[in-house]
C-alpha cells in the first residue's frame, strides 16, 4: 500500500485537481490546490484527463494514461507498483493506493477521504482509465494500452 496523503476537495468539481495534488505530494512536489484548480481549467463540470496530464507535466511529473480492457485488468491497476489516478464512475477522479493487509483496495477520494473497498466494488466503479507516472511493472499488455491524447470520456 502506498502512503498517499488524503486531501479533501473544497468543491465537488475540483476532484481532478485534488487527485492530482495527492499524486504530486506523493512524489514530494508541493503545489497549492487553488493553483492546480486554476491550471486545470476547472469549470462547472470539473476538468478533463487531458488537463490533469498537462498540468502534471508542467510540475515535473509526466503521466501516462492507460485504457484497460478486460475483466482482469482491475488487478493490474490495484496491484501496480505505484499509486495512480483512476477515472471513477465515469464522472470522478480518485487515487488507488494499493491493497491493505486485509486484501481490500485503499482509495483516496477527493470527496469522501480515504476508504477501503472490495476488489469487486472497485471493478464496478473503475471506468477503465488510469493515469500513472511512467509504466508499472507487470502490466498485461494485451488488455491495456497507452492513450496518447484522446480520452474516452472527452
Indicate where each model-derived feature is located.
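Short beta->alpha connector loops
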Residues: 69-70, 89-91, 112-113
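Noncatalytic regulatory segments and standalone regulatory/sensor domains
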Residues: 40-47, 78-85, 97-154
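Beta-rich nucleic-acid/ligand-interaction surfaces
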Residues: 72-76
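Cysteine-nucleophile protease catalytic domains, especially the papain-like/related folds used
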Residues: 1-68, 82, 90, 151-153
Amino acid at each position: 500500500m502506498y502512503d498517499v496523503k488524503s486531501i479533501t476537495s473544497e468543491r465537488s468539481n475540483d476532484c481532478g485537481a485534488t487527485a492530482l495534488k495527492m499524486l504530486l505530494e506523493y512524489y514530494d512536489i508541493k503545489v497549492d490546490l487553488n493553483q492546480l484548480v486554476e491550471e486545470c481549467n476547472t469549470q462547472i463540470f470539473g476538468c478533463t484527463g487531458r488537463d490533469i496530464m498537462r498540468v502534471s507535466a508542467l510540475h515535473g511529473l509526466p503521466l501516462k494514461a492507460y485504457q484497460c480492457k478486460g475483466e482482469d485488468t482491475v488487478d493490474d491497476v490495484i496491484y501496480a507498483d505505484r499509486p495512480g489516478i483512476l477515472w471513477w464512475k465515469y464522472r470522478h477522479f480518485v487515487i488507488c493506493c494499493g491493497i491493505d493487509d486485509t486484501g481490500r483496495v485503499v482509495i483516496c477520494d477527493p470527496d469522501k477521504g480515504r476508504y477501503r473497498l472490495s476488489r469487486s466494488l472497485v471493478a464496478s466503479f473503475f471506468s477503465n482509465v488510469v493515469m500513472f507516472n511512467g509504466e508499472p511493472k507487470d502490466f498485461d499488455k494485451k488488455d491495456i494500452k497507452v492513450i496518447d491524447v484522446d480520452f474516452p470520456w472527452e
